A protein has these predicted regions:
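Substrate-binding N-lobe of the ribokinase-like
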Residues: 2-3, 23-90, 286, 290-294
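Conserved phosphate-binding/catalytic loop of the ribokinase/pfkB sugar-kinase fold
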Residues: 56, 81-83, 93-130
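Short beta-strand scaffold segments in enzyme catalytic cores
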Residues: 45, 90-94, 102, 215-219
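Conserved post-catalytic alpha-helical subdomain immediately downstream of the catalytic base
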Residues: 205, 228-295
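Conserved phosphate/ATP/ADP-binding segment of small-molecule kinases
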Residues: 148-226
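Gly/Ala-rich phosphate-binding loop of Rossmann-like dinucleotide-binding domains
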Residues: 48, 148, 253
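Positively charged, low-complexity intrinsically disordered leader regions
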Residues: 1-23
């Protein structure tokens, strides 16, 4: 089974700050570093480090060579990673002393993905291959509909949540991975009623709900499972969700019991928040195993 991550790649400029800047405020940063990032790149690295057979499809600009190199170093297949005219997507990230972050995105080449390019990528994948998607690339509804017609298992992380999601038929989605805010946005109601909304409107849809400090909850027609977070010192939360997604998807692809999938995904996410940076913080599978032996 192949895992295709059709997704974004960004250059992350990370600024350490005393506190997240407020409107009209100017502050000095304590430090600045540049990392490879983007939800798509982070998730491809997490997928690969979790042991998945992952292909990354997407676009970079001529300034994105470092992103290509880090994916190659992590054994991600780059057959469908192409170079477009213009600049690579980038993010300006503030990280405060508690590890919380605030992110400003420039889409760049991520929003140059055409329907023709999407068609050329998807023609090489087939029924039951897994397609991982986020909402940081252009023509997402076309990609979803085309992949669904092929019978691919589509796992969608609707982040950042915006009006594009109105054009996505959730009946085409195998599994949604989302946090509480995204759950409220997609359902149009409170988080308390989300589970009933999902079961009443999309009974076959699997839901992976990440709940921050309250852990994670998996919801499907047949079962519900929960797992708490592992208590660690938080340094940087930037790649926590992407790390969780990568380990979760690989677990699904390997048909592991959901309790084991949640345990490994939670452990990987805990390790990710204990280090600075996005891609550099994503743990290898062996590190997750060692962590679980000690916790």
């Amino acid at each position: 089974m192949k895992i295709l991550n059709f997704a974004s790649l960004n250059i992350d400029m990370v600024y350490d700050v005393e506190h997240i800047v407020s409107p009209g405020e100017t502050i000095l940063s304590l430090n600045m570093e540049i990392f490879a990032g983007g939800k798509g790149l982070n998730q491809s690295i997490a997928l690969a480090r979790a042991g998945g057979n992952v292909f990354h499809a997407g676009l970079i600009g001529d300034d994105g060579e470092m992103l290509k190199n880090i994916l190659a170093e992590n054994n991600v297949n780059l057959e469908y990673l192409k170079t477009a005219n213009g600049k690579t997507g980038h993010a300006i990230i503030q990280v405060d002393k508690s590890g919380e972050n605030c992110i400003l995105l420039f889409s760049g080449a991520n929003h140059q993905i055409s329907t023709d390019f999407a068609h050329e990528v998807l023609k090489d994948f087939s029924k039951d291959d897994i397609l991982v998607l986020q909402n940081e690339i252009s023509n997402l509804p076309y990609i979803v509909k085309t992949a669904a017609k092929k019978g691919m298992k589509i796992i969608l992380n609707p982040s950042p949540f915006n009006e594009v999601m109105e054009d996505i038929d959730l009946n085409d989605i195998y599994c949604l991975i989302l946090n509480e805010i995204e759950a409220e946005c997609i359902s149009g109601g409170s988080i308390d009623g989300f589970e009933n909304w999902a079961k009443n409107n999309y009974p076959d849809l699997k839901i992976m709900l990440t709940l921050g400090k309250k852990g994670a909850k998996f919801i499907s027609r047949d079962l519900t499972a929960e797992h708490p977070i592992f208590p660690v010192k938080t340094v940087d939360t930037t790649a926590a969700g992407d790390t969780f997604t990568g380990y979760f998807v690989v677990g699904i692809s390997e048909n592991k019991p959901i309790e084991d999938i949640l345990k490994y995904a939670a452990a990987a996410s805990a390790l990710a928040v204990s280090k600075k940076g996005a891609a550099p913080s994503i743990p290898e599978f062996k590190a997750v195993e060692e962590f679980l032996k000690q916790n």
